[in-house]
């Protein structure tokens, strides 16, 4: 199947995943530099009364002579409009950067900032909410595949190498960035029985949107590159609905024997629900096969 056909097929499937509030699931596959890549995703709405605020992307594209795998989790708060906007625009903005192939880290940083600026400009339409983001881009060259992960907030990327979990993203917690927040004139609350919050409101120190808090928040992503080699088993992307109740290594151990990526993603979300996670849960598993 041609790259454009794969892209449209997967894009349509993921868009369809938000037509209801029930569990949604899907999968796809491709070849990158001779390596078989299979992915699966699963989403479950949490216990809150608001509509589903987790969105994801799982698709393949071509950029010049390079085949790409594009995967992302967007965990919204105070509404679904910002994560929905990110799902539709963030990867397009990244790929439009002229230095994307030569310097993907710089391209991603620029695109994150440009996208956040657009969200803030469009606050009248998009509302006062915001979103985390974790993006993972597989870039194939003639003989290798490289993974570039970026994130703001607490949605997480974890890779399994020979069965050992390695976190590629950074959890942007308010306490960790207290100095920066206070330097900008904000504060971090630490009320008994609650998590630390920026200005007593938001439980992450970096996010897209959140116009009312933006003076004290950052949308600057942490970005890291990781080679996909013979020791790479799979990649997990998930919102904090999973990570609140499961460690990185526990997640890897739960699915290490799964051959089907979709079944693995579904299993992780079900385990999170069984462990009393009340938040929306979205999970993507990307498996790498020789």
Curated annotation (Swiss-Prot):
Cofactor note as given: Binds 2 magnesium or manganese ions per subunit.
Domain PPM-type phosphatase residue range list: 38-288
UniProt superkingdom: Eukaryota
Pfam families: PP2C
Binding site for Mn(2+) 1: 75-76
Enzyme Commission code(s) on record: 3.1.3.16
Reaction it catalyzes: O-phospho-L-seryl-[protein] + H2O = L-seryl-[protein] + phosphate; O-phospho-L-threonyl-[protein] + H2O = L-threonyl-[protein] + phosphate
Keywords carried by this UniProt record: Hydrolase, Magnesium, Manganese, Metal-binding, Protein phosphatase
Gene Ontology MF annotations: metal ion binding; protein serine/threonine phosphatase activity
Gene Ontology biological process terms from the UniProt entry: signal transduction
Cofactor: Mg(2+); Mn(2+)
PROSITE patterns given in the database record: PPM_2 (PS51746)
Sites where the protein binds Mn(2+) 2: 75, 240, 279
PANTHER family per UniProt: PROTEIN PHOSPHATASE (PTHR47992)
Family under the similarity heading: Belongs to the PP2C family.
Protein's UniProt name: Probable protein phosphatase 2C 62
